[in-house]
Amino acid sequence: TIPSSVTSIGIDIFDNCDKSLEITVSCDSTLAKDDFGEASEKVTYRHSLVKTDAKDATYTEAGNVEYWTCENCKKHFLSDETDVETAKAVEQSATVKPVPVQVATATTQIKCVYGQDMDEINLQDYVKNADAVGGVSVKVATGSTMLDGMQLDGGKLSGKPAKVYTNGKDVTFTFTAKNGNTANLTLHFLVAKADPTVKVAVDGDTHTEGDLVSELKLILSGNNTKGLAEIISEIKALAAGENTLTWKFTPEDSENYNVVTGTVVVNAQTTTTTTTTTTTTTTTTTTTTPTL
């Protein structure tokens, strides 16, 4: 091998050498093939390679694939081919096994209620080695779908669930690090039915002892959830004074709202009994006849 320190050579110095001779020249040599005259076809430029063994990446430190580095030109290769014409150099980044994304294992179910603001979830909090991977971006994984009414913005999950999932729903998120590595995290959401908004009153200003409960009418006042309210008390008739009646509300949207019960108080007036007394006056007339 002719080292790179040799900068000139006699043009006919190899003319009488064996035809099978290979003239090896360092890859960084300044000598051109023409400098060897008729022996130029025997010249092969070669790298002087040093092997680096493969090393697995950890959650805190990058690893590398098996690769070779030329001692002379400092280029990197993924094979031990030394021929300059056939060896393909790669960027050093191609030899690196980047740090994998480490995400926490989600074991807790996330409980929400239909139509109510959920507690904001910062999905970045699930990444255990964000600094080592240079930060991550988050998106809903391919093939997975977000819950209706929820939004993902900048890695933060928020919103009002717009559909009940009493048996739960899994949503998978993909975390992508700046180094290109990815990891998935699946969260299990439980969305419970909401209690409807109900304000019940009994129709009518006055009620009397003995009024039949079955004839009382309930009215919904205020901003109520759509549905039907009915009295379900076993009381047949109102008693004098306060009567606590139980009602049941059945929402129209029974898929997303619970059936609820409550009570309403009805005041009943005492029945007034009027007694009429009749007085009879008898007049007796006495006639006196004088005696003669």
Identify the residue ranges that each predicted region occupies:
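Enriched for extracellular/lumenal, surface-exposed ectodomains of secreted and cell-surface proteins
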Residues: 27, 69-85, 173-181, 247-260
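Structural signature of tandem-repeat unit edges
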Residues: 1-8, 18-32, 44-45, 58-59
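Core hydrophobic positions of leucine-rich repeats
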Residues: 1, 8-19, 33-39, 70, ...
